[in-house]
C-alpha cells in the first residue's frame, strides 16, 4: 500500500466577499489514520470535506486520493432516493452481494433443465459463490439487521420520502458503513444518534481498517476514536497528534505562549481540562458538589463575580425547595404508549440529562411540563416559585433578513431580562456576538451561530428552571464548553435533552432514560455512572442499541 492514501498540497478556498476560508493547507493522510476535525463554526470544516470528496473543485492548490482509493462521504444533508424503502436504500451498499445471491438462486433453478450447459452453470456458480464468500453474503440479513439495530433505523418497509431529516441521516450513514470504502469522510456523523448508537459507532470506527476523517463536536467520540486532531484556525490546518484530551493539553500550552487576548478562552479550556484530569471518581463527585453549592450560586455576590462568562444564562427569581414533581404519568400517541407510569422529583439545584432514542417522547415531556400538552393520566406539579424558560430545537422560526441584534432586541436599546433591565447590545454580546457580528444577517449565520442566537432569544425571560431541547446541536466545541460552564454556574435547575455524553458527564446530576415500551428510568448521577449501573445490573448487552419497541394500547 502507498505511504499516503490522500494528499493535499497548498489547498486554498476563497468565498464571497473574497474571504480566504482555507489557505495554504498541505497535508498527507496515513492509511488507517483516525482524524477528528475541530474548528469554530464557519471555519471551513464542511468545505474541507467537500473538497476531499471531490465535490468542490473550485480551489487553489491540489487535493487528490491515491489511485484506486475508494472514498465514502457523509454530508450533513445526504441525498437518498425518496421512492425507495429503507431496506432498498441500505441494499444499495451491498448490491453486488444482493445481485449475486439472486442470480445464484436462478442458477440453482437452471440445473433442473436437462438441456442446460452444466459446465457453464458450474463456472458461473463458482464465480457467484466467490463473491458471496468474500462478503460473508450468506449472513447478509444478519449483517443488515445488526447495523439497523445499532443505528436505530426505521422499519425496513418505511418509505424514504416519509422519513425525518434525522432518520434519513441514519439510513445514509448505515449505507455508507456497509459500503466499506478505504476512506470515510464524515460530516457530523453523531448528529441524530442517541448515546448508545454513538458508542456503537465509536467501536465500529475504532476497529475500521481504513482512514477516517470526521467533523464532530462529540468529545468522547474524539477521545475514543481519534489518533490525530486537525484544527482549522483562521484558515490554516494545524495537525495535532493525539486524541481530544491530548489536544486540550497541547492547546493549553500553546495558548499560554500567546498574548493575553486569549485569556478568557484559555480560562474556559482550563475549567474543562481540570475536569478531564480528575479521573472518574473526581468527575462523579462533581454533580454532588453542584447540589451542595446551590446556595452560593444563588447569591448576588457570586453572580457579580461571574459576569465574564462567555455565554450568559440570565438568572431568574430565587427558587424554592419544591421544583418539579411527576407522579404516575402516562402519555400515548395513537396506539403507542410513550410514557407509562413515570414518577420522579427534581431536587433543588439539579441538572437532569434526558436521554433515549429519537421519537421516544422526550420533547413530549417538555411540552407537558410547560402546559402545551396534557398527560393521559398522572400529574406534573411545579413549585410555586418556578419560572420556566424553554429552548426548543426548532431554529428556523427566525427572520433571516434581520440582523442578529434586531432579532434578539426587537430594535430596543434597553431590554428587560428577567426582572432586570440591561443594554440590548451588552446582552447580545454575552452570547459571543461581539461588535460587527451583531450586524450580521440571520440568514448568513452558521448552524452554531443560529444555535447561540436561539439561546439568546429564548433565555431572556429569566427563568429559574430551564427546559433545553437539544441545545448542543450544531454548536462548536468552544460554545459547548461555554454552555457547560454557564449551566454549572446557573443559580437554578435545568432539564436538558442531549445525546452528547461528554456534555452530560460534565453537567448532569441526574439522568432520565427513555427505554422500550414506555419505560422511563430516573437515576441520580451522570451519564457514565448510569452506564456503569446498567452494565452492573443488566449486563453488557443492556448498553447495545436496538430499534425502539413501543408498547401498544390494549384494545
Question: What is the role of each PLM region?
Answer:
Residues 1-263, 307, 313-555:
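ABC ATP-binding cassette signature C-motif
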Residues 250-293, 297-304:
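Intracellular alpha-helical coupling/juxtamembrane segments of multi-pass membrane proteins
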Amino acid at each position: 500500500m502507498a505511504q499516503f492514501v490522500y494528499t493535499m498540497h497548498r489547498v486554498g478556498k476563497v468565498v464571497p466577499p473574497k474571504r480566504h476560508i482555507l489557505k495554504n493547507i498541505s497535508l498527507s493522510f496515513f492509511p488507517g489514520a483516525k482524524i477528528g476535525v475541530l474548528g469554530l463554526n464557519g471555519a471551513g470544516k464542511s468545505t474541507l470535506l467537500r473538497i476531499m470528496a471531490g465535490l468542490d473543485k473550485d480551489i487553489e492548490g491540489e487535493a487528490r486520493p491515491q489511485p484506486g482509493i475508494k472514498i465514502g462521504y457523509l454530508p450533513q444533508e445526504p441525498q437518498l432516493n425518496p421512492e425507495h424503502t429503507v431496506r432498498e436504500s441500505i441494499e444499495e451498499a451491498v448490491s453486488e452481494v444482493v445481485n449475486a445471491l439472486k442470480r445464484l438462486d436462478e442458477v440453482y433453478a437452471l440445473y433442473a433443465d436437462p438441456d442446460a450447459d452444466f459446465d457453464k452453470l458450474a463456472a458461473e456458480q463458482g464465480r457467484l459463490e466467490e463473491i458471496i464468500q468474500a462478503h460473508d453474503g450468506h449472513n447478509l440479513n444478519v449483517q443488515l439487521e445488526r447495523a439497523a439495530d445499532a443505528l436505530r433505523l426505521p422499519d425496513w418497509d418505511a418509505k424514504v420520502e416519509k422519513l425525518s431529516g434525522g432518520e434519513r441521516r441514519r439510513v445514509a450513514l448505515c449505507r455508507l458503513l456497509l459500503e466499506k470504502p478505504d476512506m470515510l469522510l464524515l460530516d457530523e456523523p453523531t448528529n441524530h444518534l442517541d448515546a448508545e448508537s454513538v458508542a456503537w459507532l465509536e467501536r465500529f470506527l475504532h476497529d475500521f481498517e481504513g482512514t477516517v476523517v470526521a467533523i464532530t463536536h462529540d468529545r468522547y467520540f474524539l477521545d475514543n476514536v481519534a489518533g490525530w486532531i486537525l484544527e482549522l484556525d483562521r484558515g490554516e490546518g494545524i495537525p495535532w497528534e493525539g486524541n481530544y484530551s491530548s489536544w486540550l493539553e497541547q492547546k493549553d500550552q500553546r495558548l499560554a505562549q500567546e498574548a493575553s487576548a486569549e485569556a478568557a478562552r484559555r480560562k474556559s479550556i482550563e475549567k474543562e481540562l481540570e475536569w478531564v484530569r480528575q479521573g472518574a471518581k473526581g468527575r462523579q463527585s462533581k454533580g454532588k458538589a453542584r447540589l451542595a453549592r446551590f446556595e452560593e450560586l444563588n447569591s448576588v455576590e457570586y453572580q457579580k463575580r461571574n459576569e465574564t462568562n462567555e455565554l450568559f444564562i440570565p438568572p431568574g427569581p430565587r427558587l424554592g425547595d419544591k421544583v418539579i414533581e411527576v407522579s404516575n404519568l402516562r402519555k400515548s400517541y395513537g396506539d403507542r404508549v410513550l410514557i407509562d407510569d413515570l414518577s420522579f422529583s427534581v431536587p433543588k439545584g439539579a441538572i437532569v440529562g434526558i436521554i433515549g432514542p429519537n421519537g421516544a417522547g422526550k420533547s413530549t415531556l417538555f411540552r407537558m411540563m410547560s402546559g402545551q400538552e396534557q398527560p393521559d393520566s398522572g400529574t406534573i406539579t411545579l413549585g410555586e416559585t418556578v419560572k420556566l424558560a424553554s429552548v426548543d430545537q426548532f431554529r428556523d422560526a427566525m427572520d433571516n433578513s434581520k440582523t442578529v441584534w434586531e432579532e434578539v432586541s426587537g430594535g430596543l436599546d434597553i431590554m428587560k431580562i428577567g426582572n432586570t433591565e440591561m443594554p440590548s447590545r451588552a446582552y447580545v454580546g454575552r452570547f459571543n456576538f461581539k461588535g460587527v457580528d451583531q450586524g450580521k444577517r440571520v440568514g448568513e449565520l452558521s448552524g452554531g451561530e443560529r444555535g447561540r442566537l436561539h439561546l439568546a432569544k429564548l433565555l431572556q425571560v429569566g427563568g429559574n428552571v430551564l427546559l433545553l431541547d437539544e441545545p448542543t446541536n450544531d454548536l462548536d466545541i468552544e460554545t459547548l464548553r461555554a454552555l457547560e460552564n454557564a449551566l454549572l454556574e446557573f443559580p437554578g435547575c435545568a432539564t436538558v435533552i442531549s445525546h452528547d455524553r461528554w456534555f452530560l458527564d460534565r453537567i448532569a446530576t441526574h439522568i432520565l432514560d427513555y427505554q422500550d415500551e414506555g419505560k422511563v428510568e430516573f437515576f441520580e448521577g451522570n451519564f457514565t455512572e448510569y452506564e456503569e449501573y446498567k452494565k452492573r445490573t443488566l449486563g453488557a448487552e443492556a448498553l447495545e442499541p436496538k430499534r425502539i419497541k413501543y408498547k401498544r394500547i390494549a384494545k
